[in-house]
């Protein structure tokens, strides 16, 4: 059976610093849906791009990589409630109908609510996206104009059909109050985000804060081969400021292209805009001085971590170029 891969899609630059709050890897899950006869709704939340497997059928019909409902034979529409992986402010949504050509919904709308206790039935649902026309086998990226914090969303499709992927882009809003808990303060699920970078030719630095170890070399930050003096760098913001106790740098899958060294600079700063941080970052003090790297290896640093009472932003320097898979900053919220 031939397997078709989804066409490459370039995420709008404005969304690069946002988190997909509906990513199953950070805990997003289906709460309930009106129907998923042809394809389970949970497939819609997968991180991987959708595929199409020719001649693959199951007991319900053609296997599709997404959420697909049966043909509606009465008035109404289908819907699905999703618990976001983390609460956040929603800035944009991507309703992806890739490979749904004769079975995509005519239109869709989106609502959201804040229900930290999980009781969506008594929560106040707010409109996020009005009823919007959809097309066959394509991404549909819509801006959202609502500054509230949401824990759940409800996707409504009219009248029925299939959606390959649903991505909810926003800013994580998480307040960790347990100052005794050690956690990865840079992790995606804890609000870490990318601010800027020198190069991302082969892999984006947002992969550095993804959950788990990298699945392959593409699931990391990799720059082009440097032909001029200097080195590559990226700026990242912690979800909440904290005191760093341990650093992990993982070069998983990078074997002939890992950097010679990596160093990390850090600062605690309030009220600075992202563009202001870029030139300032060159002069930040070191949190971790340059360390030699090995291929396909987790490098752990305890005694090498330099004293900082509080860190809110870091600059990762990859010397001179190459690729790393993950960066973890273990510490406590201050």
Curated annotation (Swiss-Prot):
InterPro entries: Allantoicase, Allantoicase_dom, Galactose-bd-like_sf. GO terms for molecular function: allantoicase activity. The keyword Cell division does not apply. Keywords: Hydrolase, Purine metabolism. It catalyses: allantoate + H2O = (S)-ureidoglycolate + urea. Its EC number is 3.5.3.4. It is an enzyme of class 3 (hydrolase). Disulfide bonds: none annotated. The keyword Hydrolase applies. Pathway: Nitrogen metabolism; (S)-allantoin degradation; (S)-ureidoglycolate from allantoate (aminidohydrolase route): step 1/1. It comes from the Bacteria. One of its GO terms (biological process) is purine nucleobase metabolic process. Belongs to the allantoicase family. This is Probable allantoicase. It comes from Acinetobacter baylyi (strain ATCC 33305 / BD413 / ADP1).
């Amino acid at each position: 059976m031939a397997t078709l891969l989804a066409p490459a899609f370039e995420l709008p630059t404005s969304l690069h610093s946002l988190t997909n709050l509906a990513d199953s890897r950070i805990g997003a899950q289906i709460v309930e849906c009106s129907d998923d006869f042809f394809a389970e709704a949970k497939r819609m939340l997968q991180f991987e791009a959708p595929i199409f497997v020719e001649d693959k059928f199951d007991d319900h019909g053609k296997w599709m990589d997404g959420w697909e409902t049966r043909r509606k034979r009465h008035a109404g529409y289908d819907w699905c409630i999703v618990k976001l992986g983390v609460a956040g402010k929603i800035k944009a949504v991507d309703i992806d109908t890739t490979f749904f050509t004769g079975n995509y919904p005519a239109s869709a709308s989106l609502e959201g609510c804040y229900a930290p206790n999980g009781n969506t039935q008594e929560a106040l649902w707010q409109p996020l996206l009005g009823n919007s026309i959809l097309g066959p086998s394509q991404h549909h990226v819509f801006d959202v104009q609502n500054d509230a914090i949401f824990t759940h969303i409800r996707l409504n499709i009219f009248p029925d059909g299939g959606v390959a992927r649903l991505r909810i882009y926003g800013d994580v809003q998480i307040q960790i109050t347990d100052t005794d808990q050690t956690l990865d303060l840079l992790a995606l699920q804890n609000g870490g985000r990318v601010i800027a970078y020198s190069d991302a030719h082969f892999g984006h630095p947002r992969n550095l804060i993804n959950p788990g170890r990298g699945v392959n070399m593409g699931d990391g930050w990799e720059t082009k081969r440097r032909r001029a003096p200097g080195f590559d760098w990226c700026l990242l913001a912690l979800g909440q400021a904290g005191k760093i106790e341990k650093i992990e740098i993982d070069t998983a899958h990078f074997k002939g292209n890992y950097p010679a060294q990596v160093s990390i600079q850090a600062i605690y700063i309030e009220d600075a805009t992202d563009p202001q941080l870029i030139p300032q970052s060159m002069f930040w003090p070191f949190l971790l001085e340059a360390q030699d790297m090995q291929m396909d290896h987790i490098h752990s640093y305890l005694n090498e971590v330099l004293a900082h009472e509080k860190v809110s932003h870091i600059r990762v320097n990859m010397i001179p170029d190459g690729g790393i898979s993950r960066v973890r900053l273990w510490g406590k919220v201050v």
